[in-house]
């Protein structure tokens, strides 16, 4: 039996990833990734992930806007409700975060060398914007210890500037979600 008390689940637009840890611990075990073809058997998946562990706490990171502790995904017919999951699986806690909200909270675990800035400047406060491509375009705003979740999604807003920055000259791309980007950096800030 796995002795970890926390299950972390990331449900993105394309893949689902999960790992086990303990609350307050930055290390993970049993990290897994699978293509996200269907979430029809979501309850069965969670049951299987909880079966051989002492997990009583789950944190979900899901692509989509969070409203009233629930997220309806932007690119598929799936909705997740943290309160219902906590009750259904008899959990102590079940937290639901927008995917880029999760990234925003994780930023302080990285060092300055892990980031590339779009524009060099002298910092004058603790606010910054984190953006990045995935199935859609994601972003979060960080102000001190607070993270403001966003949902840009599949959009062409700002696409000319992004294509210019990344030196993409083709008119073939008319939405960020159609662009697969490989960048020589670990993070974009």
Model-derived features: where do they sit?
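Ser/Thr-glycine-rich phosphate-binding loops at phosphate-binding pockets of nucleotides
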Residues: 14-16, 136-137, 179
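Glycine-rich phosphate-binding loop of actin/hexokinase-like ATP-binding domains
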Residues: 120, 124-174
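A glycine- and small-aliphatic-rich helix-loop capping segment at beta-alpha/alpha-beta transitions
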Residues: 23, 76-79, 110-118, 144-149
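Short beta-strand-loop/turn "lid" adjacent to the catalytic site in phosphate-handling enzymes
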Residues: 52-96, 101-114, 130
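Short coil/turn connectors at secondary-structure junctions
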Residues: 3-4, 91-92, 124-128
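Short glycine-rich, Thr/Ser-proximal phosphate-binding strand/loop in the N-terminal lobe
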Residues: 2-45, 147, 152-153
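Conserved small/polar residues in nucleotide/adenosyl-binding loops
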Residues: 179-185
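A polyampholytic, Gly/Pro-enriched intrinsically disordered region
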Residues: 102, 113-122, 173-177
């Amino acid at each position: 039996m796995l002795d970890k008390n926390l299950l972390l689940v990331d449900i993105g637009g394309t893949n689902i990833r999960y790992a086990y840890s303990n609350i307050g611990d930055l290390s993970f075990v049993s990290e897994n990734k699978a293509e996200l073809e269907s979430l029809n058997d979501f309850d069965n998946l969670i049951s299987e992930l909880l079966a051989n562990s002492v997990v009583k706490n789950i944190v979900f990171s899901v692509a989509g806007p969070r409203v009233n502790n629930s997220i309806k995904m932007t690119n598929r017919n799936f909705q997740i409700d943290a309160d219902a999951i906590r009750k259904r699986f008899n959990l102590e806690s079940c937290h639901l975060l927008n995917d880029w909200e999760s990234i925003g909270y994780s930023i302080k675990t990285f060092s300055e060398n892990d980031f590339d800035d779009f524009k060099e400047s002298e910092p004058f406060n603790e606010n910054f914007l984190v953006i990045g491509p995935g199935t859609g375009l994601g972003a979060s705003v960080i102000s001190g210890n607070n993270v403001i979740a966003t949902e840009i999604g599949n959009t062409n807003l700002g696409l000319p500037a992004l294509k210019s920055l990344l030196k993409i000259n083709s008119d073939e791309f008319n939405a960020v979600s159609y662009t697969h980007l490989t960048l020589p950096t670990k993070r974009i800030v």
